[in-house]
């Protein structure tokens, strides 16, 4: 196999003294013919490399740069290595690192010797490709040839260590650089600080800022920006704020980016008032906020339901000629939709269009959700079709929103059509998609179709969650398929998924309504053993089951237990027992329960009042009962 650089077994003293030896410098890197770019002939504009300035090189397109390289290697004599260095540097700035490596190999094969600068470019490219062992091999080769790496080369290697999860080696490299007489610059320190934050070594990163000063390298705006960003991501906002004061004391103006970072962090950690105060502070200091500043604050205010404050900020930024963007409008539209203020959301959408700001998927999805919430399904569908016509393609969340809207409106067949359309577009439905459809079919009394969707969900490899199972069990029980529900419930109990009290309530109610009161009671009694605490619905459901079976004494006993040990009875509990005693002709117990219910500030519900009214007509009750309930 061909080799790009032959490495001597002795190497250079620098390589052997440093951690660079960890990169297996004793092994030459293989040929890079596997790289994804090759020099090809292009029929583009022809360039004379002798007449191209550095500025023009930076303006070259990739195809033209490769074409120019082809012309250079055909020239005799070859252009100087300086000309090749300029071209390789320009291509590296396009982030075409594989191509630079491939061209470097071709230069060597043609006998064009590399110099310090081209070696440095190649090392940087290998580091950017996360091929540290090859970068170290090139470094060893250049040092064997007598080239001492400069600070730029070592910074490239340092960056490679930081991004290659070798942060300890990066720290050691900086220490060895100092020992060997190299003066780390701000890029060195900034790279290492960023790397330390990436590897959760924040205290070392902050301490390094003070070390910079000791080493005669003043932290710059970039340094502080990296540290502030790292601290804010960790939630160390107080430390970030103290660093802000330190900057001002050091006569370094923080700038809008650093303020934005802290304001956004304060918003994320729900310190909205502190964020607004910092916003005022930066404004008073003459640091002009930008659209990013406003977006953070508007989003946060919307999350807190402070619509008027958010709207005022929008007006303020427009007055100051700071143009809101799609993020600004989308945040406000989504917030207004969630608050039920669809008219305001539509006005913002119209304003957005008037300003020639194209809505994104988030904007469209929010409005579709709003239309669905207000049962304006035709408009929701129109908005859905509009976004597709604008080449803004819906994602799973958008589809789920519209499917839910159709299912809620008992138009489940249209929801199913959307589900099929999803598949045709290559989108895979998630747990929410399938659960929504299952619920929709049950609401439409299409029990068989609901079960078919559940089976398809399982066969498609989409895992049902506890909500899916609860909806399935509830639908089966309500459609008289309790035996099927029991089979599903038994499977659920054997699985690793833990049913919640909502699921247990469904099964207890289903059993009781199907006449399996004893089974319902057994399940009720087993809850404490399972570590599940019955709630007021559980107790009321079980009492209702007892009453339906004529077991009034058991219902009363459970009611007493509930008042002593369980959750406090609610209106539903009292009304259930009142009706049971009235049907049984026990007027005294009914009257006592009504008085107790009224003392708890509950009133009779429609079913109880209806029963009392009918019994009044039949002469089985006097009007005093109706007065007690009123």
UniProtKB/Swiss-Prot annotation:
The keyword Transit peptide belongs to this UniProt entry's keyword annotation: yes
Record-level GO cellular component terms: mitochondrion
Record: transit peptide: 1-22
Keyword Ribonucleoprotein in annotation: no
Annotated localization: Mitochondrion
Residue stretches of each PPR repeat: 80-114, 115-149, 150-184, 185-219, 220-254, 255-289, 290-324, 325-359, 360-394, 395-429, 430-464, 465-499, 500-534, 535-569, 570-604
Family annotation (InterPro entries): Mito_RNA_Proc_CCM1 (IPR051114), Pentatricopeptide_rpt (IPR002885), TPR-like_helical_dom_sf (IPR011990)
Main location class: mitochondrion
Keywords of this entry: Mitochondrion, Repeat, Transit peptide
Pfam assignment, any one: PPR
Family (UniProt): Belongs to the PPR family. P subfamily.
Record's protein name: Pentatricopeptide repeat-containing protein At1g63130, mitochondrial
């Amino acid at each position: 196999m061909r080799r790009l650089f032959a490495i001597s077994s002795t190497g250079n003293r620098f390589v052997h003294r440093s951690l660079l030896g960890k990169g297996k410098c004793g092994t030459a890197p293989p040929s890079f013919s596997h790289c994804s770019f090759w020099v090809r002939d292009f029929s583009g504009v022809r360039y004379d490399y002798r007449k191209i300035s550095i500025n023009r090189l930076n303006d070259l397109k990739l195809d033209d740069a490769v074409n120019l390289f082809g012309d250079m290697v055909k020239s005799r004599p070859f252009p100087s290595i300086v000309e090749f260095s300029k071209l390789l540097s320009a291509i590296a700035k396009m982030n075409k690192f594989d191509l630079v490596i491939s061209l470097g190999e071709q230069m060597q094969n043609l006998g064009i010797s590399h110099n310090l600068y081209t070696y440095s470019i190649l090392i940087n490219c290998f580091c950017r490709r996360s091929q540290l062992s090859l970068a170290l091999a090139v470094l060893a080769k250049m040092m064997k040839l007598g080239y001492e790496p400069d600070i730029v080369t070592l910074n490239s290697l340092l960056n490679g260590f930081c991004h290659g999860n070798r942060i300890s080696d990066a720290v050691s490299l900086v220490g060895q650089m100092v020992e060997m007489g190299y003066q780390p610059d701000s890029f060195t320190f900034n790279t290492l600080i960023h790397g330390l934050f990436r590897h959760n070594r924040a205290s070392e990163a902050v301490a390094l800022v003070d070390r910079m000063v000791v080493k005669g390298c003043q932290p710059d705006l970039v340094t502080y920006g990296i540290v502030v960003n790292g601290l804010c991501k960790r939630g160390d906002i107080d430390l970030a704020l103290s660093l802000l004061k330190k900057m001002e004391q050091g006569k370094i103006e923080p700038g809008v980016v650093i303020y934005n970072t802290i304001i956004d962090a304060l918003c994320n950690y729900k310190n909205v008032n502190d964020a607004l105060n910092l916003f005022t502070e930066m404004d008073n200091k003459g640091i002009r906020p930008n659209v990013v500043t406003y977006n953070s604050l508007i989003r946060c205010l919307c999350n807190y339901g402070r619509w008027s404050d958010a709207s005022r900020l929008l007006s303020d930024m427009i007055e100051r000629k700071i143009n809101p963007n799609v993020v600004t409008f989308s945040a406000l539209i989504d917030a207004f939709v969630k608050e039920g203020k669809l008219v305001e959301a539509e006005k913002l959408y119209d304003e957005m269009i008037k300003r020639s700001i194209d809505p994104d998927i988030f904007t469209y999805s929010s409005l579709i959700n709003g239309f669905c919430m207000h049962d304006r399904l035709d408009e929701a569908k129109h908005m859905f079709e509009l976004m597709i016509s604008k080449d803004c393609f819906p994602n799973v969340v958008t589809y789920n929103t519209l499917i839910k809207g159709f299912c809620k409106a008992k138009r489940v067949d249209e929801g199913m059509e959307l589900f099929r359309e999803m598949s045709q577009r290559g989108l895979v439905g998630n747990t929410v998609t399938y659960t929504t459809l299952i619920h929709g079919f049950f609401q439409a009394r299409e029990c068989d179709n609901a079960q078919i969707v559940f089976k398809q969900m399982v066969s498609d490899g989409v895992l049902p969650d506890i909500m899916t199972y609860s909806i399935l069990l509830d639908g089966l029980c309500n459609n008289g398929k309790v035996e099927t529900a029991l089979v599903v419930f038994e499977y659920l109990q054997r699985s690793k998924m833990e049913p919640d009290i909502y699921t247990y309530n469904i099964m207890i109610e289903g059993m009781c309504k199907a006449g399996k009161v004893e089974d319902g009671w057994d399940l009720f009694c087993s809850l404490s053993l399972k570590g599940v605490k019955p709630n007021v619905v559980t107790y009321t459901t079980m009492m209702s089951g007892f009453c339906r079976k004529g077991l009034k004494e058991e219902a009363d006993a459970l009611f007493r237990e509930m008042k002593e040990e369980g959750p406090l009875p609610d209106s539903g509990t009292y009304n259930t027992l009142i009706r049971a005693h009235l049907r049984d002709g026990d007027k005294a117990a009914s009257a006592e329960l009504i008085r107790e219910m009224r003392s708890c500030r509950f009133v009779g519900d429609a079913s109880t009042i209806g029963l009392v009214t009918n019994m009044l007509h039949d002469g089985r009750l006097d009007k005093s009962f109706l007065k007690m309930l009123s």
